[in-house]
Amino acid sequence: KDADSLLQQQFPSCHNLLADLIDNNLLLKTKYSFDEENIDSVVFSYQRISDFIIAREIVNKFQDWESFAENINTDKTLHSIFVDKHWSFKGILEAMAILIPERFAHEMTDVIRFIPEDEYERVYYTCLNTISEAQINSLCWRAIESIDKETIIQFLGSKYCHINPDDWYNKLVELSTIPNHSFNADYFHALMMGLTMPKRDSIFQFFFNDCAEYDNDRCANPLRRLIDWAWSEDVSVKADSESTRLAAIILCWLLSSTYIKHRDEATKALVNLLSEQVEVLIETLRQFENVDDMYIYERLYAVAYGVALRTSSRDGLMKLARYVYETIFKRNSPPKNILLRDYARNIVEY
């Protein structure tokens, strides 16, 4: 009745609008349990759109960040979404994680300090889990300029963050090929280069070995999707150079995997991805010149040799050969790794 009355007020000339929207599957008629009573209700068929519209209406009620945050405990709707029934409003929380930074220039996780300690104890695991997941999931959908990188990094290192490390690494792979994103492959590369090889392997080997596959439902994990995309036909011609560069960085780090199947898959994917983008290959080689893992450096030169054999660019091949000669042989102190030297020699001779 309420939905029908509202539509009649807004669109008085459309007498059967509610029925038409339901018939066309834009709205869905359902039963909603409220105070042990089943009530007929109408919801959006497209849940993400519904969540976004609801979140926008809630956020727009407040003039600034202070009024929004301070009402977390006094506004019934906000308290229900963030605390009491947060598990029922994950989609709305995720939409709020997109809207709050754009409207108030604050990350949604800043609301945590407004939750009283007694409330915090009561909802420690569940509430913070839901807010943390919504915050991380929102990064795929947000305007790049609205992301406060330092605030998010501080949150990730705080006691309030309840995110499984593999979930965060999967999210970084999802974001990796987005140009200019705060958490794209350049961020991942800086993170990895800042660690020693033993530390890196202790943190990431399980992720690389487990998350470069399909899950139990045969859905590809983000790293597997990246491999499959890099293997696709004509990808080296169709992909823009910046997305190619970012994808190559992630695949290069997969070369450190102790699982030879994944190293081989990453090697072949890189050859296919870079075969017509030799300048991107050279830039990638430069980025990994100081890597302390010979697994990666050796395989990168295997990739370079594969690209040299496949590329149709004579000019690109000359640039690659010149780079390899100047980097490996010019100073008369080539690396001790015999396979790496052999790949490099074959590139120059070819």
Task: Kindly give the residue locations of the regions a language model identified.
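Alpha-helical solenoid scaffolds in eukaryotic proteins
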Residues: 74-76, 95, 107-110, 190, ...
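Alpha-solenoid repeat scaffolds
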Residues: 28, 60, 64, 88-89, ...
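C-terminal leucine-rich, beta-strand-based interaction scaffolds used for sensing/assembly
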Residues: 3-161, 197, 212-216
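Long alpha-helical HEAT/HEAT-like repeat alpha-solenoid scaffolds in very large eukaryotic proteins
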Residues: 281-350
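HEAT/armadillo-like alpha-solenoid scaffolds in large eukaryotic assembly and transport factors
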Residues: 6, 107-113, 141, 236-239, ...
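Extended alpha-helical scaffold segments
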Residues: 121-256, 265, 308-309, 321-327, ...
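Extended amphipathic alpha-helical scaffold segments
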Residues: 235-295, 299
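Solenoid-like repeat scaffolds
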Residues: 71, 77-81, 112-118, 195-197, ...
